[in-house]
Amino acid sequence: MIDFSRIQKELQDCERNQDSSGIRVCPKSDNLTRLTGTIPGPIGTPYEGGTFQIDITMPDGYPFEPPKMQFSTKVWHPNISSQSGAICLDILKDQWSPALTLKTALVSIQALLSAPEPKDPQDAVVAEQYMKNYQVFVSTARYWTETFAKKSSLEEKVKRLVEMGFGDAQVRSAIESSGGDENLALEKLCSA
């Protein structure tokens, strides 16, 4: 059974330290089983200046089972699926320990952005590009960061969609649920 008191304590710890690390965790629901993590892109990487959101689902066995985490912000990285946001990181699988926390998992994901492991990829296409044409990889990763993870670009997307006649809250929700993809958000808004 989920230890909700531990999750609450971890959320409080993250809130206390968010200014220094930039890492945040917020509940998506009242029952604390769905959370959103936010990490800043590491300095000196193609992800610098970006803010990346991670969907977190707490399993019934937490803290003895790892939280399920995946990027909702699109990211170009060998160990992260460019399609689904799935993350290839050992501590989110067989190397999880109850001594680890949500914050340590998010710090580890942030470190993964700094140090890709292309020989153990989640996304083979990105890993191949990383190994065969590193400069193109860096350019693509920067472009994705600019397009999907920069706040200014988010505000520009919101503005464009609001100008089409959709409500601000509705637009922000559609963009978030689309991982920052403006075209997919527009499709969702039009089909709603």
Swiss-Prot record:
Q: What is its EC number?
A: 2.3.2.23
- Tissue expression as described in the entry: Expressed in seeds, pistils, siliques, hypocotyls and leaves.
Induction notes from the record: Up-regulated by syringolin, a cell death-inducing chemical.
As one GO molecular function, the record gives:
ubiquitin conjugating enzyme activity
Do the record's keywords include Ubl conjugation? no
- Highest taxon of the lineage: Eukaryota
Alphabetical GO biological process terms: protein ubiquitination
Question: What's its job?
Answer: Accepts the ubiquitin from the E1 complex and catalyzes its covalent attachment to other proteins.
The UniProt entry's sequence similarity note says:
Belongs to the ubiquitin-conjugating enzyme family.
- Output this protein's name: Ubiquitin-conjugating enzyme E2 27
Record the organism.
Arabidopsis thaliana
Q: What are the top taxonomic ranks of the organism?
A: Eukaryota, Viridiplantae, Streptophyta, Embryophyta, Tracheophyta
